[in-house]
Amino acid sequence: MANHKSAMKRIKQTAKRTERNKHERSTLRTFIKRVREAVATKDQEAAKAALAVAIPVIDGAATKGIIHSSNASRNVSRLTKLVNTLG
């Protein structure tokens, strides 16, 4: 356990940030999953709509530092390629 006031504050801040980041990461995964599910059902319109919603969420997570910017770019690229395979 922390002995200093500042260390205790840091522990609280870290816990709060961890919870916030968990929620953001979970939301991110949900939107990515929606795109993949739409592609799996071969519904091109739904896949494009899901991708249009997912891209800003992915970019926002990169901006907030939840994921690395390279990870965000890779996700967007792969999902876009996946949706484009539908025709």
Swiss-Prot record:
Residues 1-27 are annotated as: Disordered. Residues 16-27 have a biased composition (Basic and acidic residues). Residues 1-15 have a biased composition (Basic residues). SUPFAM superfamilies: Ribosomal protein S20 (SSF46992). Keywords: Ribonucleoprotein, Ribosomal protein, RNA-binding, rRNA-binding. Pfam families: Ribosomal_S20p. Gene3D superfamilies: Ribosomal protein S20 (1.20.58.110). Disulfide bonds: none annotated. One of its GO terms (biological process) is translation. The keyword Ligase does not apply. One of its GO terms (cellular component) is cytosol. GO terms for molecular function: small ribosomal subunit rRNA binding; structural constituent of ribosome. The keyword RNA-binding applies. Binds directly to 16S ribosomal RNA. NCBIfam families: S20. Belongs to the bacterial ribosomal protein bS20 family. This is Small ribosomal subunit protein bS20. It comes from Citrifermentans bemidjiense (strain ATCC BAA-1014 / DSM 16622 / JCM 12645 / Bem).
